[in-house]
């Protein structure tokens, strides 16, 4: 490990005066300007900034960056260091793959910097890259105009907090194979394909926590049928908590869970989603979706894909309202409030204003052990529909209030064909369904 004497000797040979180095060692912080960084210099200052970072790490003192814009790229951090920027301190991306790259390190703090990728347009770059890093804190930073990703983290443990990320060509924050990352209180806007992604290379424990983020205007430039266009996307990552986020105007889902286990989605505000607002799909198990407010979407909440192993969920205390007649982005999506298929409880939800079905229970034979009770379903074309197709499993529909249905209140269906328009009256014809105590107004 480099000690102070080695650092001073090495940097002195790089034409830095000993007085500058001695002053840096004597202060409680290292000033980047002492290493030649100058906001008036419009050229590349990467080598100067790298020396300042290395000096701060070796001296175990914070690095202070004054206000101004500095063009740098591929700055590497491999040991503990704190970098703090004054208001207006901006790192503009030069030629390279990233502005800062943390790798194989721990105890790193990046605080108060602006990362600007405007000069990297046309290159698929990352503003901040974090790989195999523990106890990392990124806070109070701005990330602007990335040609690729704002923050790309692989095997990171730590926090990304109170940052603003906007005009990102791909995804604002992409965390892969995390070790308990916390993404808290960030503001994310105008991203090409995703807001926050928490993914894993293989299914397994992740433990990330996403809380209090504001996400808006997420497009799906790369296309597809759900892998892009989501505010929050969790893929193969287990034990993730998503709560109290405000998510508006996503091309596909506000929150999309794919092949996850034991995920909690609670207390989120989801508005104007172009497809299913909250989607738990493809081999998931153990999803809790509760106390969310959905206003405007092509469909509300989906806990489906039993054919691919999707099962075991609770959907409770949500409000779903004001759905669209069709999806602007996925022609296969039909409007429904809540869709559920296997090993699930749907209870205490309020659904209003669906130009389709309020609650859809099962699809063809893909239905098993579903409880639907104590819900309020208002002003939907059809209130509740349950599958009675050959092979469909059991469902209990009880104590719901279905009010103001445009066509039918509670129906039985085989795939998309209604075989009973009045299921409470015809319930004895279908052995897989129990219907009791519902109020139809």
Identify the meaning behind each predicted range.
Residues 1, 21-34:
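C-terminal segment of N-terminal export signals and the immediately downstream linker at the start
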Residues 1-15:
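N-terminal secretory signal peptides and thylakoid transit peptides that target proteins
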Residues 32-66, 71:
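Acidic Gly/Asp/Thr-rich repetitive segments characteristic of extracellular carbohydrate-active
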Residues 50-58, 70-84, 91-136, 148-156, ...:
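Extracellular beta-strand-rich solenoid/capping regions of secreted or surface-exposed proteins
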Residues 54-58, 143, 247:
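Residue-level signal for alpha-helix termini/capping positions
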Residues 72-75, 87-88, 93-98, 118-126, ...:
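Short glycine/acidic-rich loop motifs that flank beta-strands on beta-rich extracellular proteins
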Residues 101-111, 128-139, 156-159, 179-182, ...:
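Surface-exposed loop/turn motifs in large extracellular/passenger domains
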């Amino acid at each position: 490990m480099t000690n102070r004497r080695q650092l001073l000797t090495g940097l002195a040979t790089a034409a830095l005066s000993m007085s500058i180095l001695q002053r840096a060692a004597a202060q409680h912080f290292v000033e980047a300007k002492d290493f030649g960084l100058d906001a008036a210099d419009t050229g590349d200052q990467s080598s100067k900034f790298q020396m300042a970072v290395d000096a701060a790490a070796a001296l175990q003192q914070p690095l202070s960056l004054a206000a101004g814009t500095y063009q740098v790229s591929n700055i590497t951090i491999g040991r503990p260091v704190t970098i703090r920027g004054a208001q207006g301190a901006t790192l503009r991306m030069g030629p390279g793959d990233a502005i800062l790259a943390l790798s194989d390190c721990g105890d790193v703090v990046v605080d108060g910097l602006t990362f600007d990728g405007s000069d990297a347009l046309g290159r698929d770059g990352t503003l901040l890259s974090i790989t195999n890093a523990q106890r990392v804190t990124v806070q109070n930073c701005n990330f602007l105009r990335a040609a690729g990703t704002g923050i790309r983290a692989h095997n990171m443990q730590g926090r990304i907090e109170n940052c603003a990320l906007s005009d990102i060509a791909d995804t604002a924050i992409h965390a892969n194979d995390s070790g308990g990352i916390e993404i808290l209180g960030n503001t994310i806007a105008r991203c090409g394909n995703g807001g926050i992604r928490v993914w894993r290379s293989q299914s397994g424990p992740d433990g990330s926590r996403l809380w209090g983020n504001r996400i808006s205007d997420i497009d799906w430039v790369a296309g597809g049928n759900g892998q892009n266009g989501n505010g929050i996307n969790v893929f193969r990552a287990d034990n993730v908590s998503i709560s109290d986020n405000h998510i508006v105007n996503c091309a596909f889902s506000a929150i999309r869970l794919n092949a996850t286990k034991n995920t909690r989605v609670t207390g989120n505000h989801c508005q104007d989603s172009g497809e299913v607002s909250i989607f738990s799909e493809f081999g998931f198990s153990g999803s809790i979706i509760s106390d969310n407010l959905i206003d405007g979407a092509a469909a509300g909440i989906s806990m489906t894909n039993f054919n691919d192993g999707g099962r075991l969920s609770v959907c409770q205390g949500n409000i779903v309202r004001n759905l669209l007649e069709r999806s602007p982005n996925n022609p296969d999506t039909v409007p429904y409030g809540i869709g559920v298929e296997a090993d699930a409880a749907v209870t205490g939800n309020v659904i209003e204003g669906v130009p389709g079905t309020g609650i859809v229970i099962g699809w063809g034979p893909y239905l098993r052990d579903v409880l639907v009770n104590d819900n309020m379903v208002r002003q939907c074309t059809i209130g509740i529909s349950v599958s009675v197709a050959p092979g469909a499993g059991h469902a209990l529909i009880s104590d719901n209030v279905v009010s103001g249905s445009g066509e039918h209140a509670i129906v039985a269906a085989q795939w998309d064909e209604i075989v009973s328009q009045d299921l409470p009256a015809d319930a004895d014809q279908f052995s897989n369904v129990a219907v009791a105590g519902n109020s139809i107004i």
